[in-house]
Structures are given as C-alpha cells and as structure tokens.
UniProtKB/Swiss-Prot annotation:
One of its GO terms (biological process) is regulation of carbohydrate metabolic process. Homodimer; the beta-strands of each monomer intercalate to form a hydrophobic core, while the alpha-helices form wings that extend away from the core. This is Translational regulator CsrA. It is found in: Cytoplasm. The keyword Zinc does not apply. InterPro entries: CsrA, CsrA_sf.
Length: 81
C-alpha cells in the first residue's frame, strides 16, 4: 500500500488517466475529486460492498429458481413420454 500526504489543491496521478485531487480538509473529513475515464467505475467502499452483497443474494435466488425450472422441465418431459 502506498501512503501519501497531500494538501488542498494537490493531487496524485494513477497511471496517466486517473487523477485524485484534494478539494477540502475539515476536521476529520477530506473532500476529494476523482477525474477518470467514464469506463472506470468509482464507488464509495460502503456502496461497493452493498452491491457485492446484493449480487450474491441475486445469484443465490437465481440458483434456486434454476433448480425449480429444471424440476418443472423434468416433470413435464417425463409426462410427455
């Protein structure tokens, strides 16, 4: 992990296409701006964790639903013969 100190209006570059600019420092809060290409997704960590958890729940539901659908197909095709 790289640890840097920056002052207001100073920035860091990540590769050549991402810049993190320090806009404001107040007590225990730092306001930053991130300039990055549109195809780079940027999330606050708590939002990212929420998205991951929701995706996991969705996958579990899908697995359950696929099992139900498979069972219905098997039942249907057994009755066809």
């Amino acid at each position: 992990m790289l640890v840097l100190s920056r002052k207001v209006n100073e920035s860091i570059k990540i590769n050549s296409n991402i810049e993190v600019l320090i806009l404001e420092i107040k007590k225990d809060t730092v306001k930053i701006a991130i300039k990055a290409p549109e195809n780079i997704k940027i999330f606050r960590s708590e939002i990212y964790e929420f998205i991951i958890e929701e995706n996991k729940k969705s996958i579990l539901k899908d697995k359950h639903n696929i099992g139900k659908i498979k069972s219905l197909f098997n039942h249907y095709f057994k009755n066809e013969n």
